Amino acid sequence: MLLITLNENTLSLSPGSQVIFPHQTWEDYERLLSLRLQKTYPKLYFNRKTQEIRLMSPLPSHGNRVDTLRDLVKIILRRQGKDWQCFDPITLKMLGEAGLEPDTCFYIDNRQAILGKERIDLTVDPPPDLAIEV
């Protein structure tokens, strides 16, 4: 059963649900992000070309699949002798164009550029080398 709560103070979506809002703007996306406060769910995606905002609230088992893929990438990177910086949760925004929240992302080649940062700003920071969305 889909249960969505959306008012001027709250944004929530029942686990396993997805909702798409057509005809939306970047300002609408930013407003929804602010309603979510510091929570990581529901995940929010915006695409200016489609003018859609997508809200997604994964099931608890979703995290297990993300953990497995993240661990697999780490094993491969260790075997290759590469250093990395992993970010999750993270909101990646290209101002006015797109906003997305991958399940996890890795900075490998661009690791040095973001070391010590708690937030990524794509207007000055490079994008992740690898983003995983399950």
Question: Residue spans of the language-model regions?
Answer:
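Gly/Pro/Ser/Thr-rich low-complexity, intrinsically disordered segments predominantly at protein N-termini
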Residues: 1-134
